[in-house]
Design a protein with these regions (language model features):
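N-terminal auxiliary segments of SAM/dcSAM-dependent transferases
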Residues: 1-59
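C-terminal substrate-binding/active-site "lid" region of AdoMet-derived donor-dependent transferases
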Residues: 2-8, 121-124, 132, 174-242
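Conserved alpha-helix/loop element of class I SAM-dependent methyltransferases that forms part
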Residues: 18-21, 42-49, 63-87
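Residue-level signature of catalytic and energy-coupling elements of molecular machines
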Residues: 73, 92, 160, 238
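Helix-to-beta-strand junctions that scaffold the AdoMet/dcAdoMet cofactor pocket
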Residues: 83, 106-107, 180-184
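Conserved class I S-adenosyl-L-methionine
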Residues: 83-94, 111-113
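Conserved SAM-binding loop of SAM-dependent methyltransferases across substrates and taxa
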Residues: 94-108
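S-adenosyl-L-methionine
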Residues: 113-169
Length: 243
């Protein structure tokens, strides 16, 4: 089950991110600044993250060492196509760390479809996250076979976020986009270089995956190295080219 979090009573400051809606920067009592999202389920945390309250609103501290999306934001990514009201397909949801923050961002007017193949991870996702968040649907499916779960996804999605340790990450993402993504929709892919080719230089792997997306009809906006938060990882952000 979800954990009951402990709020801090120490005064701090929370301010909206200057670029991205429903993402915040929290200044903690020791002066450090951390990313945060407004908690959709007040009083509950997901992975032991700290809960803080500012002006009557509860926020969840977002650990960039446990979330590649948070790492990309701290590294200065210019496009985060996940916002209030967005419908998101999340491939490789694992136990729900980052999906829970995506759930906070899209809010009750948005929705997150979470595809995960590992049974233990999907169990944690169901019991600790989806059970308390009505805007999340967990799907025990193989992201390489989008046709198997198409019946569970209503309409087209605004954004596909992909974090799967597969050798053909960009192809997998593009295959899902062909089925589920809206025209001119966006994708974000957290590329793990060693899952694709351990013999290649990571930067070469990132270029290869970006080129695959281009060949599949995407305009690649950014390729962002995620070190020091994640070694040999990059975030690629792309938009489907208008037909």
């Amino acid at each position: 089950m979800a954990r009951i979090g402990v709020e801090t009573d120490v005064p701090l400051k929370v301010k909206p991110h200057p670029k991205f809606k429903e993402i915040y920067t929290a200044t903690l009592e020791e002066g450090s600044q951390r990313l945060a999202t407004r908690n959709l389920t007040p009083g509950l945390n997901v992975y032991g993250e700290r809960l803080v309250k500012f002006k009557g609103v509860e926020y969840r501290i977002w650990d960039a060492f446990r979330s590649k999306l948070a790492a990309a934001i701290l590294k200065g990514v210019q496009n985060v196509p996940i916002e209030p009201g967005s419908k998101v397909l999340y491939l490789g949801a694992a136990s729900g760390t980052t999906p829970s923050h995506v759930s906070d961002i899209v809010g009750n007017s948005g929705y997150v479809y979470c595809v995960e193949f590992a049974q233990r991870s999907i169990r944690d996702l169901v019991n600790n996250v989806a059970a308390y968040r009505p805007n999340i649907s967990p799907l025990l499916e193989d992201a390489r076979m989008p046709e198997k779960y198409a019946m569970f996804i209503s309409g087209k999605v605004d954004t596909i976020y992909c974090d799967v340790a597969q050798p053909e990450q960009a192809k997998l993402l593009a295959d899902n986009a062909d089925v589920f993504l809206k025209p001119a929709g966006w994708v974000m892919i957290a590329v793990k270089a060693q899952s694709i080719d351990v013999t290649m230089d990571p930067e070469a792997v990132y270029r290869q995956e970006a080129n695959i997306l281009r060949k599949r009809g995407f305009d690649v906006k950014e390729v962002l190295n995620l070190e020091p938060f994640d070694k040999a990882h990059a975030m690629i952000v792309a938009q489907r080219c208008k037909q």
